[in-house]
Amino acid sequence: MNNLMGFAIGHLTVIEISGADRNKILNNLCTQDLRAIQPGQVKETFILDVKGRTLSHGVVACLDSRTFFISSPGQAQRLVPHIDRYIIREDAVVRDASEEFYAFLQPPESRWSVANRREYLGDKECSERDSDQTLCVSAAWLGQGTVLILSKAQSQDVWDCQSSDCMDRQGWELQRIESFWPWYGVDIDEKNLPQELGINTRTISLNKGCYLGQETVARLDALGQVQKQLASVNLHLAQDGGLTSPYELVLEGKSIGFVTSAARISSTEVSGSLWAGLAMIRRGYFQPASQFLLDGGVLLKVG
């Protein structure tokens, strides 16, 4: 992989909320404490339904006059009506802006980040440039220091600059997995509880007060355990073959989970093939440093 290059990843879910009460509305629907979020700040969060299940996972980027929720593609049709349902008398308007932007991811070591991060973001975590209609967001999708660039199609200068210095989206999967950034619709969906992702400290405030789904989150926090959890894994396949997600993890004839995302690790030191992955694993098997020889001879290491 050429670490000097970024990644062109296409359209994402981009939801815009405007109005004086926009952050109040989001705070009532998110696990993160957004009561005091200021322009230029970014917060990672879950959006929950009334039962405390994960409707989405992504980042909230606050600007001077509007706030964006950004996540994996294909969610706006569900999320916009969900948010709008809870706007009653508040000064807030929600709309789908997904098709207006094309996304580029720039890791901290990429040529673009080295040359332009300071100019585009300064000391902020997000900013909007009217000159080229570009939204820049600090989002740890490929690790701390990653910049997500949302460029409008008509911003040809930015488009040309980014496209010439970016690979297609296929190459970024390994970095996303190693950075433990779950992808909604792949690693998690509406069946999951937020604590099953194992990123509580990044995404959940236990002190913010009431929000939609809060009772379920608080109850699970009091119990202190989940029945399954997303974990970082490495797999060593004895044969030099492929691994397609979802990949079932079977130990002594019993399913202990599924690999939800996987990317091959280049190595000349071992026979067969090595894979990094994210896996939803049953309780009793997802503890870090656990190691299992699965049925079929696959060696699973939980990291």
Report each predicted region and the residues it spans.
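Acidic, low-complexity central loop/insert segments
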Residues: 5-14, 59-182
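Short, conserved phosphate/pyrophosphate- and ester-handling motifs at nucleotide-, phospho-/glycolipid
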Residues: 19, 108, 213
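Active-site beta-strand->loop segment that positions catalytic residues and contacts the acyl thioester
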Residues: 49-65, 234-242, 283-284
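Short, intrinsically disordered, mixed-charge
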Residues: 27-35, 75, 81-89, 222, ...
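Solvent-exposed residues in well-ordered beta-strands and their adjoining turns
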Residues: 18, 72, 151-152, 236, ...
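Acidic, proline/glycine-enriched N-terminal capping motif
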Residues: 1-57, 61
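Glycine-rich, small/acidic residue-mixed loop/short-helix segments
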Residues: 175, 192, 198-204, 212-214, ...
